[in-house]
Amino acid sequence: MADRSERSGVEILCVGTELLLGNILNGNARWLSEELATLGLPHFRQTVVGDNRDRLIALVQEIAQRSRVLIVTGGLGPTPDDLTTEAIAAAFSVPLEERVDVWSDIQEKARSRGRTPSPETRRQALLPVGAEVLWNPTGTAPGMIWTPVPGFSVLTFPGVPSEMKAMWKATAVPWFRSSGLSKGVFVSRLLHFWGIGESTLAEQVADLLEGVNPTVAPYAGRGEVKLRITACADVSSKAWVLVDQIEQELRQRTGNLCFGVDEDSLASVVLKRLGQTGQTLSVAESCTGGGLGAELTAVPGASSVMLGGVISYSNAVKRDLLSVPEDLLTQHGAVSAQVAEAMALGVRRLTGSDWALSITGIAGPDGGTPEKPVGLVFVGVAGPDGCSTEMLRLGPTRGREWIRIVSAGEVLNRLRLRLMVND
């Protein structure tokens, strides 16, 4: 075993064959990485391993040679393939003991839900001798904080994200703050951009991307680009000043391309602007099939702004519900600027909303023609000052779902820009 002076940093180990095979997205590792950065903790490596006892043991022993702290998620349940606690104990040849307090907690939680704990559940009360319990406030699987050898500690959490996050905030954060591992206070802010590609944005801010403190890192999403600003200082107030300075510079260079920060989405930003002025919104959708309405209504408080929507997939619904003239459909086709305009005006009139959005297009993979290929989309924005339409050529290569998502984002962004002009 390595000397404690040779170890450094924090590692994350995520356990589960479903993660290894890609059946489940590994959101825990991403969330934990951000938490570690916020705490100013050096984080050097992430690993995913399946539900295999021997591989788990070997990995834990390997990590103990090089790192100060190992964070493990997953494998704490009651079934035979939940091997995390057993494997970690075996890695250091330490026996497991049943913790009476843990078993009592498991039984009490089962009774409060009108259940009787199964015999298998008792396995969750087994912890290595000397380990400290990490109590699970919402589930039955406890975690642990354990220092099996000097200079190396293990923290285990359930794989269920909500349980893991609650336990992390309640117990792990205080432990890390008192551990002496922090290299300062790290803070970060995420800026969201629409209407510019990742490479183009990177060129505009190339000098800022080379900075050391703060750092600026780009991330590409589906239609949007994100820049994360991260700064470190001895106290958070100083770190935030550094972040604010870089954010101001980024906004000056990019203008209205930046639409939000942190948890903002185009939908939430648009709804907030409309709500502040007491205005309402409705939508008419064809190729997005309700995706635009779903994005809007996913935002808490959307009901104060969002009046309703129409999924007008067929020409008959466009004509009968939205009053799209038959001659427009015949002359220009359902996928056209003229029909997008009529859809937006129609749903605005139907619902009595202040603003209305429309989308009509060809999401593919079939249905395209040389004149109107897959990825051709028209969007409309109707408001008190009239209706505008835009043609989008999104192309077929990225697939149907990408076309649908980007179409919804494009029309929301156009409404955002219209609202900025009207402010």
Swiss-Prot record:
One matching Pfam family: MoCF_biosynth
Leader sequence segment: none
Top-level taxon of origin: Bacteria
InterPro entries to which the protein is assigned, alphabetical: CinA, CinA-like_C, CinA_C, CinA_KH, Competence-induced_CinA, MoaB/Mog-like_dom_sf, MoaB/Mog_dom
Protein family (similarity comment): Belongs to the CinA family.
PANTHER family in UniProt: NICOTINAMIDE-NUCLEOTIDE AMIDOHYDROLASE PNCC, NMN AMIDOHYDROLASE-LIKE PROTEIN YFAY
Protein's UniProt name: CinA-like protein
